A protein has these predicted regions:
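Short, Lys/Arg-rich flexible segments
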Residues: 1-226
Length: 226
């Protein structure tokens, strides 16, 4: 069974930048906190959507469902009546980096070429060869993944999926898997980590300015609009 790997990306927010904007547009502390919480939720949902698309594109995943299972957003909203600058709501994105099944990825499947059976030079009889020793090959469409081959494997449609299947020593077969953690970690750094702060600040500023312009206030104890 493939190793279970994960990567959790935390939102790194510059609190001083939030406070600077609050003072600049004359927003209240609670308006800032409400805008912060809403921006956090919007950022988590936005980056989840972007992450799924990033996984599909970077790994050439066949179906959206397989990619969606690899991204989980977690948002912890704190009570605004108890929040301080050092105790704000938090969010993170969890990425599953364990191996993908071959059938989940786009690419070329190839059975091994039939091996010419050798003959005994003295008798002319065919010599025995190890059945299935040579393996099938998978060439991923994604440039971030390398071609792979598995000993004693073959290409066939089993259990509703055309893939590379490996013969097990104990009997039976299992589907071959492709390691993706390195390619995914690079994509996460390139697509997500570099942009998450900018996306959050865009949502935060938009929301906070709207609250100030509309004179929107909330009760710090109930969180209800006044």
């Amino acid at each position: 069974m493939a190793d279970l790997r994960s990567n959790a990306q935390m939102f790194d927010i510059d609190v001083s930048a939030l406070e600077q904007l609050r003072v600049e547009i004359s927003a209240t502390q609670h308006q800032m906190l409400m805008a912060y919480n809403r921006a956090l939720n919007r950022t988590a949902k936005h980056m989840h959507r972007v992450s799924v698309g990033m996984i599909i594109e970077s790994l050439a995943v066949k179906g959206r469902k397989a990619a969606e299972k690899r991204v989980k957003p977690f948002v912890k909203i704190r009570n605004i009546s108890k929040e301080t600058a050092g105790d704000l709501s938090s969010a993170k994105l969890w990425y599953g980096l364990n191996d993908f099944r071959v059938s989940e990825l786009k690419g070329r499947l190839q059975n091994p070429r039939r091996q010419k059976q050798p003959r005994d030079p003295e008798t002319g009889l065919f010599l025995k060869t190890k059945k299935g020793a040579r393996g099938a090959t998978f060439t991923p469409r994604s440039a971030g993944l390398a071609m792979m081959s598995w000993p004693d494997s073959f290409v066939a449609k089993r259990y509703g999926a055309k893939s590379v299947w490996i013969r097990l020593a104990r009997g039976g077969i299992e589907e071959a898997r492709v390691p993706v953690h390195e390619a995914l970690e690079d994509a996460i750094d390139d697509y997500i980590f570099e942009n998450i702060g900018t996306v959050f600040m865009g949502f935060f500023e938009q929301d906070l300015r709207g609250r100030v312009k509309g004179n929107v206030h909330v009760d710090p104890k109930t969180g209800k609009r006044l």
